[in-house]
């Protein structure tokens, strides 16, 4: 296959072809990735007659190389001469669809599915369907698994006799001895059902579905639950009760929690597929059971779906069903022993406010929100605080502040400093949701109180919190509201609080810009250079180094430099050191 020596233009191609045989896997991989270049150079005839047979014969390679090959072949139609020759790509892909490595098989199936659309109906019957049958009847489970993904792409365009054969082959795969094959069939059942005629769905797909849904392996049963969504969408309402619901009821009470989890996970899709009547009679009780399930994973999956499930209930019975059947379960979940369950619920529970309206929210939901705000799990608290806006829209800021704000203030003053820290971290989020006026009235004093907390980590977090608030509300707000209070602390008798002033100025200067920093904050820093406590004085030097780049040169020369030079003569070694460092960094030395 190597190109003739005399033809220089083909030399790189000869190299690439030789590399396909090279012992070094990296070289083989590079060559496979350039396969389209080789094919272009060889032309369509030689690609069909030489390259493809060569590739088909050498499919015993590293998985990485095979994966690249399976991917490349899916885009090869034009390189073999277009749709009339596309069947030439089937032999190498068929071999790849039988290898042991799942990733390679899946990629080969993906490429086969892609090129199936380029076959004419007669080519499908002559070339593609025989391949599907060979794979489906293969000795190794690997080939039978691959076959499952190929039925739905060829079924719609073949004759009714061939369709009947394909349905028979698929039925065999659904009852295969190997669980892996039944699993593959179950995962493709919904997709196959979509391309079948309605009568065949009822007469053939439903029995397969029922069998798979009662398979001895839970991994097969849970995939049947996924298929249930697709199948239910295809059937007319009057057939659902007899054909799908018995199986679905059985799955919702399956002995394996993984199957029940899958039901909970797909619950709102099932709800849309079966419609409002069956939802009311069947799914509401099933949902109650899932919310009370003994397995935490199942309760968490159901909790995630609470809001969406309630939204999808039909309007005439929605409020009644939620209040009488769903809310009692939610109340229990709020104090669940498992934090994943509580967190899942907290992420969606606020969404019930718009559904239930103002009065119900105030009477029934606010007590639950309050309980969650006080939960020991930070995830739960965060999920409530981050969704306050949708409650705010329903009940208004005043009502919200009367009920939830005391709880937030209580947490902000909690004896455990880690709880205080958590609330500080939520503060910018809260401020954004509640707006500037409300913040100034209710929360500003809290934020200032944290700056003088006795725990350093709180003071530090409160400082960076101020910066985030200024980013939200703007520097004019900072100038009017925050800066005066921060500067007032510079005269505090406690030197730790005086130092906090400097730390705040360090971060505020970044967001407030040159003008406010120079006019309002710098004078305080310079004045503090005369503080009796050395710790404060060396922090003045550090602050000047930090805010120096924001100031203009004349200010640096006339105001900052003299103070730093004075500090280099200080009797304290640390003060001297930091003053000298600041002069050097600001190029004033």
From Swiss-Prot:
Region (PP2A subunit C binding): 400-589
Function per UniProt: The PR65 subunit of protein phosphatase 2A serves as a scaffolding molecule to coordinate the assembly of the catalytic subunit and a variable regulatory B subunit. Upon interaction with GNA12 promotes dephosphorylation of microtubule associated protein TAU/MAPT. Required for proper chromosome segregation and for centromeric localization of SGO1 in mitosis. Together with RACK1 adapter, mediates dephosphorylation of AKT1 at 'Ser-473', preventing AKT1 activation and AKT-mTOR signaling pathway. Dephosphorylation of AKT1 is essential for regulatory T-cells (Treg) homeostasis and stability.
Keyword Repeat: yes
HEAT repeats: 8-46, 47-84, 85-123, 124-161, 162-200, 201-239, 240-278, 279-321, 322-360, 361-399, 400-438, 439-477, 478-516, 517-555, 556-589
Main location: cytoplasm
Protein name (record): Serine/threonine-protein phosphatase 2A 65 kDa regulatory subunit A alpha isoform
The protein's assembly and partners: PP2A consists of a common heterodimeric core enzyme, composed of PPP2CA a 36 kDa catalytic subunit (subunit C) and PPP2R1A a 65 kDa constant regulatory subunit (PR65 or subunit A), that associates with a variety of regulatory subunits. Proteins that associate with the core dimer include three families of regulatory subunits B (the R2/B/PR55/B55, R3/B''/PR72/PR130/PR59 and R5/B'/B56 families), the 48 kDa variable regulatory subunit, viral proteins, and cell signaling molecules. Found in a complex with at least ARL2, PPP2CB, PPP2R1A, PPP2R2A, PPP2R5E and TBCD.
Gene Ontology molecular function: protein antigen binding; protein heterodimerization activity; protein phosphatase regulator activity; protein serine/threonine phosphatase activity
Chain spans, region Polyoma small and medium T antigens Binding: 47-321
Top-level lineage group: Eukaryota
Pathology noted in the entry: Houge-Janssens syndrome 2: An autosomal dominant disorder characterized by global developmental delay, hypotonia, variably impaired intellectual development, poor speech, and dysmorphic facial features. Some patients may develop seizures.
Originating organism: Homo sapiens (Human)
Compartments where located: Cytoplasm; Nucleus; Chromosome; Chromosome, Centromere
Modification sites for N6-acetyllysine: 280
Record gene name: PPP2R1A
Result of altering residue 180 to T: In HJS2; likely pathogenic; disrupts interaction with PPP2R5D and impairs interaction with PPP2CA
Annotated segments matching region SV40 small T antigen binding: 85-239
Family listed: Belongs to the phosphatase 2A regulatory subunit A family.
Keyword NAD tagged: no
Segments for region (PP2A subunit B binding): 8-399
Modified residues (N-acetylalanine): 2
Keywords for the protein's UniProt record, in alphabetical order: Acetylation, Cell membrane, Cell projection, Centromere, Chromosome, Chromosome partition, Cytoplasm, Disease variant, Host-virus interaction, Intellectual disability, Membrane, Nucleus, Repeat
Entry's Gene Ontology BP terms: chromosome segregation; female meiotic nuclear division; intracellular signal transduction; meiotic sister chromatid cohesion, centromeric; meiotic spindle elongation; mitotic sister chromatid separation; negative regulation of hippo signaling; negative regulation of phosphatidylinositol 3-kinase/protein kinase B signal transduction
């Amino acid at each position: 296959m190597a190109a003739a020596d005399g033809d220089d233009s083909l030399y790189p191609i000869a190299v690439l072809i030789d590399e396909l045989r090279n012992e070094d896997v990296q070289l083989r991989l590079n060559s496979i990735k350039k396969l389209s270049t080789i094919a272009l150079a060889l032309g369509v005839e030689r690609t069909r007659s030489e390259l493809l047979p060569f590739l088909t014969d050498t499919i015993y390679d590293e998985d990485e190389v095979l994966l690249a090959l399976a991917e490349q072949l899916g885009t090869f139609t034009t390189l073999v001469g277009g749709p009339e020759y596309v069947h030439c790509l089937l032999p190498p892909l068929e071999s790849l669809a039988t290898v042991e490595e799942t990733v390679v098989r899946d990629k080969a199936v993906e490429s086969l599915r892609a090129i199936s659309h380029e076959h004419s109906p007669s080519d499908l019957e002559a070339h593609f369907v025989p391949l599907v049958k060979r794979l489906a009847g293969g000795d190794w489970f690997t080939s039978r698994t691959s076959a499952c993904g190929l039925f739905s792409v060829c079924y719609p365009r073949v004759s009714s006799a061939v369709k009947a054969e394909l349905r028979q082959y698929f039925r065999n795969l659904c009852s295969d001895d190997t669980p892996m094959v039944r699993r593959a069939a179950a995962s493709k059942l919904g997709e196959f059902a979509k391309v079948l005629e309605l009568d065949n769905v009822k007469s053939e797909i439903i029995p397969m579905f029922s069998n798979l849904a009662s398979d001895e392996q839970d991994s097969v049963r849970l995939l049947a639950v996924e298929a249930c969504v697709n199948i239910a969408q295809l059937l007319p309402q009057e057939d659902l009760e007899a054909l799908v619901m018995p199986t679905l009821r059985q799955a919702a009470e399956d002995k394996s929690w993984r199957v029940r989890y899958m039901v909970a996970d797909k619950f709102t899709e099932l709800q849309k597929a079966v419609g409002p009547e069956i939802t009311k009679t069947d799914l509401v009780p099933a949902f109650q059971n899932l919310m009370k399930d003994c397995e935490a994973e199942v309760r968490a999956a159901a909790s995630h779906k609470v809001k969406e499930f309630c939204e999808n209930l039909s309007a005439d019975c929605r409020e009644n069903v939620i209040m009488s059947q769903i809310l009692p379960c939610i109340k229990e979940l709020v104090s669940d022993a498992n934090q994943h369950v509580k967190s899942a619920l907290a992420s969606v529970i606020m969404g019930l406010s718009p559904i239930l309206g103002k009065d119900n929210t105030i009477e029934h939901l606010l007590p639950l929100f309050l309980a969650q705000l006080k939960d020991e799990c930070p995830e739960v608290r965060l999920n409530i605080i981050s969704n306050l806006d949708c409650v705010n829209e329903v009940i208004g800021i005043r009502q919200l502040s009367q009920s939830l704000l005391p709880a937030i203030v209580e947490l902000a003053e909690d004896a455990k400093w880690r709880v205080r820290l958590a609330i500080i971290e939520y503060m910018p989020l809260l401020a954004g949701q509640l707006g500037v006026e409300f913040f100034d009235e209710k929360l500003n004093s809290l934020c200032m109180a944290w700056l003088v907390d006795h725990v350093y980590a709180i003071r530090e977090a409160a400082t960076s919190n101020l910066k985030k608030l200024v980013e939200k509300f703007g520097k004019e707000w900072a100038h009017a509201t925050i800066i005066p209070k921060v500067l007032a602390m510079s005269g505090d008798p406690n030197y730790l609080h005086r130092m906090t002033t400097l730390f705040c100025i360090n971060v505020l200067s970044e967001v407030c810009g040159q003008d406010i920093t120079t006019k309002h904050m710098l004078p305080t820093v310079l004045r503090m250079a005369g503080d009796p406590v050395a710790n404060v004085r060396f922090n003045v030097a550090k602050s000047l180094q930090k805010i120096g780049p924001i100031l203009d040169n004349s200010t640096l020369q006339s105001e900052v430099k003299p103070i730093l030079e004075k500090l280099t003569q200080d009797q304290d070694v640390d003060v001297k050191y930091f003053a000298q460092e600041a002069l050097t960094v600001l190029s004033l030395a």
